[in-house]
Amino acid sequence: MASLLQSDRVLYLVQGEKKVRAPLSQLYFCRYCSELRSLECVSHEVDSHYCPSCLENMPSAEAKLKKNRCANCFDCPGCMHTLSTRATSISTQLPDDPAKTTMKKAYYLACGFCRWTSRDVGMADKSVASGGWQEPENPHTQRMNKLIEYYQQLAQKEKVERDRKKLARRRNYMPLAFSDKYGLGTRLQRPRAGASISTLAGLSLKEGEDQKEIKIEPAQAVDEVEPLPEDYYTRPVNLTEVTTLQQRLLQPDFQPVCASQLYPRHKHLLIKRSLRCRKCEHNLSKPEFNPTSIKFKIQLVAVNYIPEVRIMSIPNLRYMKESQVLLTLTNPVENLTHVTLFECEEGDPDDINSTAKVVVPPKELVLAGKDAAAEYDELAEPQDFQDDPDIIAFRKANKVGIFIKVTPQREEGEVTVCFKMKHDFKNLAAPIRPIEESDQGTEVIWLTQHVELSLGPLLP
């Protein structure tokens, strides 16, 4: 019964650019292509950037300028949780009368988990609650900025060279006699719009400005390394003052060795992204723009369109002995769905993981439509489907339990069975051309899914 909640034991095959096997809850369904889609066969588009702490929304250009970090929120350098701003009162001397003191509010950063504070590293308190926190300066900033400018100029030069070579290849392929014979010579000799090869030869990176080539000094290897202190191997080590590997990797520009060198880092921004089908370029998932909203404008998850198979009970599986496995089929749509199960044909390229022989019900299965109110209505009259008790174990609302027979074909290892599931689907997507008056109702199409079940290990 515990296998009923283990959806990762039932995999569906996605026939995309690359064959992917994944649970139905991790897949999408394109209503225009009528095919399953995985995260590897969709296009990812960034809709917006936002801070997960203060939920500030910002455009992509601003996020790039801020290096994809929030300007107001910080992460604890010790445990990586969000830092909070604490207020305290400190006594300060009056500028008019130094002998007298007055209470003044001061703010500092503190972590509620590991008790780290900005005072531990000597950061001065601030008189305002947000902004203005001291940040350590990277000694290699100038060198890195110089390298970035140099390679940007180099990339621009290479782009100009590529454009020059492309225009040099565009030459007249028709012979001069042929063009003169049919009166095309004058037409071909007319000046063409756009830049010619001669004008392109004098192209510069910035037209109208003096080009100053950026030169950088090559890095030089150091022959002599600074020796270690004499007491490096003999002095006792206090592990509470030594940073962990994760703490050092979170600050690669400083690589702090001691806990006293840990400074807070600006919090990374998160994104809201849209997913688009690569084949038809329709949206499969599109969230709302507001960071506080968890709703979606478009969310074509496969569990809302494709019948879901789950394993309800697994008997003791033994080599070359037939066992009966109970599965559940769930209809996610509101109309009746007809499902037919059949075994994979011999030599099927998709049937590569099967280790057991499976016998599925030969009859067509009818699943009732999804009705949320009927699940809680005990007085509702059940529909009469005239089920065969040898095939149907139970039926409740839009769920039905069916029996399949499994015979393991290998003496050891995991038991995996594969079969095909054919079902009808009413395509409710908006058609490209308007439906003619003679067409009645929505289009019904038949889809076939490849399903793999992981039934666990064999018993001796």
Curated annotation (Swiss-Prot):
Modified residues (N-acetylalanine): A2
Protein's name according to its UniProt entry: Dynactin subunit 4
Superkingdom field: Eukaryota
Function statement: Part of the dynactin complex that activates the molecular motor dynein for ultra-processive transport along microtubules.
Modified residues (Phosphoserine): S196
Entry-linked InterPro entries: DCTN4
Organism: Homo sapiens (Human)
Name of the coding gene: DCTN4
Family to which the UniProt record says this protein belongs: Belongs to the dynactin subunit 4 family.
Modification type Phosphothreonine: residues: T407
CC annotations in GO: cell cortex; centrosome; cytoplasm; cytoplasmic dynein complex; cytosol; dynactin complex; focal adhesion; kinetochore
Consequence the record notes for mutating C70S: Loss of ATP7B-binding
